[in-house]
Amino acid sequence: ITSVKVGAFTGAQNLDRVSLPSVKEVHYCAFQNAAITTLDLPWGELESIGFSAFAGASGLPQNPVFSKLTALSNGAFAGTSDNKNTQLRTISLPLWTGSSFSEGSGFSNSIGGIFAYCTALTSVSAPELQTLPSQMLYYCQALEEAVFPKVSTVNSGVFNYCTNLTKIDLGGAITRLSSAFMAYANKVTAL
C-alpha cells in the first residue's frame, strides 16, 4: 500500500497499531480523529499529506523529520480548542516549499492552520518554504523557535497566541507581511 485514501481511518476507535511501511501519500481526512495507540508510518518517506489528514489523531511521532515531503495541506496535523494536539514536539520540513496536495474537485487547496493547536510543539523548521500559510502555527503555546530562512510572504495569524515564542528566523527578505501575524506572541525578542 503506497496511498491511504480519503477518510480511510476517520474516527477509528480502539486500534492498537496501524503499520503501513510503504505509504507515500496520505489523502485528506485519512486518519482524522482516529484513536490509534501506535501509528507506524514511514514519516521520512511521505511525499504528500492532505487536508486534515491527521487532525485530531493519536499515535503520532513526537519528532518527525519529513525528509521527502513536498505537499502539505490545510489542517494536516491541527488540533482544536477542545482537542489539542499534544504529541508533536519538533517538526522538520527540509523540502517543503509551500505546495499543497491537490486531490481533485471539491477539495480546498488552502494550506492554512496546518499545525494549529499543536500545543506541545517547541520548534519548527522549513528551510525551503517561501510563504507562511495563514494560521500555520496558531495557538502553538509551547513553540520557542521557528526557522524559515527563505520566506518572503507572511500571512495572517501565523504565530498568533504562540506565547512562548522567542525567536523567529525569516531570513530578512520579506516582501509581504500581513496584519496580526504574531498577535499575543509577546516573548519574541529576535525577528
Describe every region a protein language model picked out.
Residues 1-3, 13-25, 34-48, 58-71, ...:
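Structural signature of tandem-repeat unit edges
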Residues 5-10, 27-30, 50-53, 73-78, ...:
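Consensus positions within tandem repeat domains that build extended binding/scaffold surfaces
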